[in-house]
Amino acid sequence: MKTAYLASLVLIVSTAYVIRLIAILPFFHTQAGTEKDTKDGVNLLKIRKSSKKPLKIFVFLGSGGHTGEMIRLLENYQDLLLGKSIVYLGYSDEASRQRFAHFIKKFGHCKVKYYEFMKAREVKATLLQSVKTIIGTLVQSFVHVVRIRFAMCGSPHLFLLNGPGTCCIISFWLKIMELLLPLLGSSHIVYVESLARINTPSLTGKILYWVVDEFIVQWQELRDNYLPRSKWFGILV
């Protein structure tokens, strides 16, 4: 009898979590787009602009071209993203951090908090080296993500990602938190695919397409031929 009760309890809990998982993964309930979406910053980035509280935004910088694209995106939408905002800046190399620090000086009203993330995988790394760095990144990023996510509670917030594989780990932890702590609500993860990806998505894009709340591409061909659930607003960076 006790075994039957335990089995029933496990079944109920498992079913509840499966339903919750379906609810938090937008892929299951987002329709494919067929036309160009309206280039409206509020709709594009899923921000409740009417809120009186300052926006809390997490931005992750990759390196090189990814950093350049993210900075241009922030600059193009500065009125929406950088107006009296609190910016949580994740980075994996010092050059990107310095570049962002120089850029953000123009917006003295923004508060910035910096978080260094290990790279999920180094270029030309062996399989063993990749496994080692991925495990280290998982542990370190978990601490950062939990701290940042709880700091955002009660305020309009956004996780804006672009580029490297570390974005997958960050998104993974955010969705785990949504699954286990439903009262936290949505993390509002937006991934912007690189301008360089015209016909096929990046490896990071292929993974995050199934996970993030909003997946944005910058070329119609990519949306129409490969990623029908994505949004296309034209060139953003």
UniProtKB/Swiss-Prot annotation:
- A GO-annotated cellular component: nuclear membrane
Please give the residue ranges for the topological domain Cytoplasmic.
Answer: 29-237
Q: What InterPro entries does the annotation carry? A: Oligosacch_biosynth_Alg14
Q: In which domain of life is the source organism classified?
A: Eukaryota
- Which GO annotations describe the biological process of this protein? dolichol-linked oligosaccharide biosynthetic process
- Keywords annotated in UniProt: Endoplasmic reticulum, Membrane, Nucleus, Transmembrane, Transmembrane helix
A Pfam family reported for this protein in Swiss-Prot or TrEMBL: Alg14
- Lumenal domain ranges by topology: 1-7
The family assignment reads:
Belongs to the ALG14 family.
Give the miscellaneous note.
Present with 339 molecules/cell in log phase SD medium.
Role description:
Involved in protein N-glycosylation. Essential for the second step of the dolichol-linked oligosaccharide pathway. Anchors the catalytic subunit ALG13 to the ER.
What protein does this entry describe?
A: UDP-N-acetylglucosamine transferase subunit ALG14
- Organism, per UniProt? Saccharomyces cerevisiae (strain ATCC 204508 / S288c) (Baker's yeast)
- What gene is this protein translated from? ALG14
